[in-house]
């Protein structure tokens, strides 16, 4: 959701994201065999593991205008739940951290309420466990280098947020009879 807001307001040019993701079910608890990725043979609870991601493809499907302009990395970390996206984004319009935060705060209070969150509280990953929103901007971490390079940190409980979006879709579909 935050990419849409920033693209509409400031015009996204390029982006590099790193998803810092909790351990997944295909990772072993102790070192063990993995079919496709040697890094994933390492214990999920003892290693920080870079893995492949299809996020850039997903972004281009949701936002076709950004196709070919995003690169994404994915790192799995030894936590049980709650992940974060660290995004570096270039935009067409000059901006500031205060303006970026204001744009995202307004969206979280209006059209994306319940989907996009916003916090200025000093929180850590565990504080977002079972948060139903798709992403929560940590406004204390927003940075702007120069006037067009934005750095953001967005927290999310992947499965819980996804389940809530599926519930939203189901409720919406139920209105079409």
Where are these regions (language model features)?
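C-terminal substrate-binding/catalytic lobe of Rossmann-fold NAD(P)-dependent oxidoreductases
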Residues: 13-14, 19-150
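NAD(P)-dependent Rossmann-like dehydrogenase/reductase catalytic/cofactor-binding core
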Residues: 129-177
């Amino acid at each position: 959701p935050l990419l849409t807001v920033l693209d509409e307001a400031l015009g996204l040019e390029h982006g590099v994201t790193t998803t810092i993701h909790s351990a997944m079910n295909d990772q072993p608890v102790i070192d063990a065999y993995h079919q496709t990725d040697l890094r994933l043979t390492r214990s999920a609870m003892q290693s920080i593991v870079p893995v492949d991601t299809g996020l850039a493809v997903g972004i281009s499907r949701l936002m076709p205008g950004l196709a070919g302009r995003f690169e994404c990395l994915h790192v799995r970390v030894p936590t049980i739940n709650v992940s974060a996206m660290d995004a570096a984004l270039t935009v067409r319009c000059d901006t500031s951290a205060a303006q970026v935060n204001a744009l995202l705060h307004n969206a979280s209070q209006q059209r994306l309420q319940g989907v996009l969150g916003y916090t200025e509280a000093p929180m850590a990953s565990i504080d977002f466990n079972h948060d139903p929103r798709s992403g929560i901007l940590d406004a204390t971490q927003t940075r702007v280098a120069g006037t067009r390079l934005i750095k953001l940190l967005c927290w999310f409980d992947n499965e819980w947020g996804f389940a809530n979006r599926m519930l939203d879709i189901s409720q919406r579909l139920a209105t079409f009879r």
